[in-house]
Curated annotation (Swiss-Prot):
The keyword NAD applies. Transmembrane segments: none annotated. Its cofactor is [2Fe-2S] cluster. It catalyses: a quinone + NADH + 5 H(+)(in) = a quinol + NAD(+) + 4 H(+)(out). Binds 1 [2Fe-2S] cluster. [2Fe-2S] cluster binds at residues 92, 97, 133, 137. It is an enzyme of class 7 (translocase). NDH-1 shuttles electrons from NADH, via FMN and iron-sulfur (Fe-S) centers, to quinones in the respiratory chain. The immediate electron acceptor for the enzyme in this species is believed to be ubiquinone. Couples the redox reaction to proton translocation (for every two electrons transferred, four hydrogen ions are translocated across the cytoplasmic membrane), and thus conserves the redox energy in a proton gradient. It comes from Salmonella typhimurium (strain LT2 / SGSC1412 / ATCC 700720). The lineage of its organism: Bacteria, Pseudomonadati, Pseudomonadota, Gammaproteobacteria, Enterobacterales. One of its GO terms (molecular function) is metal ion binding. Composed of 13 different subunits. Subunits NuoCD, E, F, and G constitute the peripheral sector of the complex. Belongs to the complex I 24 kDa subunit family. It comes from the Bacteria. This is NADH-quinone oxidoreductase subunit E.
C-alpha cells in the first residue's frame, strides 16, 4: 500500500470547504509540509478532532507523505487525535503550577467531573487534559477551558467555573 493511500476500512472524505481551505493554505508556503499544521487545525475546527483518515486526506491534498502529517499531529498537544468533549479543559501541571497548588485544582476537577485526566465526561461535555505549561506562570495555578485562560485558581472556584460552560 502506498504511504498516502488510506486503508479501505477507514472511509474518510474532506468536505469541500475543508479541501478548499487547505488548498488556500498550501499556496501560502513554499514547502507544502509547512501547511500541515494549518490543515490539521482546519479539520479539527470542523470536526472537533482529527481522525486517522484525515491524516491521509490532508497528505493527499498537500502532496506529502502521511507520516509527515502524522508527525505534526502527534507533536502538537492542541491537535486532538481522538474525540474530545464539547469543552476541553487543560490544566497546567508544570513545576511552577505545582508550587502554586495545581494538585488541588486537579483534584477539584476530577471530583466535580467524576473523571480522571485523559477522560471525557459521560455526557460528552468535558475532556480533562494535563498540559506542560500554559505560559502564564506568574498567575498560577492556571487552566484553560477551550480558548479561555483562568488564573489564580482555587479548588473552591472550580464548580462555579464549570457551570459557565454548558
Amino acid at each position: 500500500m502506498h504511504e498516502n493511500q488510506q486503508p479501505q476500512t477507514e472511509a474518510f472524505e474532506l468536505s469541500a470547504a475543508e479541501r478548499e481551505a487547505i488548498e488556500h493554505e498550501k499556496h501560502h508556503y513554499e514547502d507544502p509540509r509547512a501547511a500541515s499544521i494549518e490543515a490539521l487545525k482546519i479539520v479539527q475546527k470542523q470536526r472537533g478532532w482529527v481522525p486517522d483518515g484525515a491524516i491521509y486526506a490532508i497528505a493527499d491534498v498537500l502532496g506529502i507523505p502521511a507520516s509527515d502529517v502524522e508527525g505534526v499531529a502527534t507533536f502538537y498537544s492542541q491537535i486532538f487525535r481522538q474525540p474530545v468533549g464539547r469543552h476541553v479543559i487543560r490544566y497546567c501541571d508544570s513545576v511552577v503550577c505545582h508550587i502554586t497548588g495545581y494538585q488541588g485544582i486537579q483534584a477539584a476537577l476530577e471530583k466535580n467531573l467524576n473523571i480522571k485526566p485523559g477522560q471525557t465526561t459521560f455526557d460528552g461535555r468535558f475532556t480533562l487534559l494535563p498540559t506542560c505549561c500554559l505560559g502564564n506562570c506568574d498567575k498560577g495555578p492556571n487552566m484553560m477551558i477551550d480558548e479561555d485562560t483562568h488564573s489564580h485558581l482555587t479548588p473552591e472556584a472550580i464548580p462555579e467555573l464549570l457551570e459557565r460552560y454548558k
